[in-house]
Amino acid sequence: VDDRFSLIVGLDASNPELYGSIRGAGFEEATAFAERAIDALGSRAHVQAVRSELTEGGLEEFYKHWKQRTENVVIQKYDHFCRRLPQIRVGDLTPLNRFPCWHLQRDLHVLVDGRVPLCREDISTQVLLGNVFTDGLEKTWAAGAGHYADHVAGTFSGICQECDEYYTFSF
C-alpha cells in the first residue's frame, strides 16, 4: 500500500449497543475491519468517533479501548452540514472571529460522476463549480476562486452563512 495512503475508520462507539443506536447493525464487522486496518497500515490507520449528544457518554470508553491498540484515535466534532442536520453538538468550538474557509482554500470534493459542489458541506449541490471529467480539473478548481475571494473580503453567503466547518481541516 502506498505510504501516502491513510485510512480513518468511523466507529463512534466501542460497544455494540451504542454503535447500534447510531449506525445500526454491523458493530462486529466494523471493529474487525478497524483491527485489520491497524494491522495492515500501522500508523496510517485511525479510528474515529464523532463527539455529539449521542456519543458523549461513551467517548472515554471508546478512547481508552482503542488507545490500547493504536495511538491514532480521533475524536471529531459533530457536523450539522450547514444546519441540514439537527444540532446535537456537545460544545461550541467555533472561533470568535470568522475567517476564510480552509476547505475552499484547500479542498475539492469530487462526486462519483465528476461533479464538484462548492464544498463537502454542499450536500444538496446548490453550487456546482463544474465537472472534472468534462471541464477539467484546473477550470473546475478556478471556478471556486470567487467564493474564496468573498470569504477573504468577509462576505459569507449561501450555505457559508450557517457553516461550522470553515475552521476545520484534514491533514
Describe these PLM feature segments.
Residues 33-35, 39-46, 66-91, 96, ...:
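C-terminal accessory region of radical SAM enzymes
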Residues 1-64, 72:
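Radical SAM/AdoMet-radical enzyme domain recognition
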Residues 11-15, 51, 79, 114, ...:
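Short, flexible active-site-adjacent loop segments at beta-strand->alpha-helix junctions, enriched
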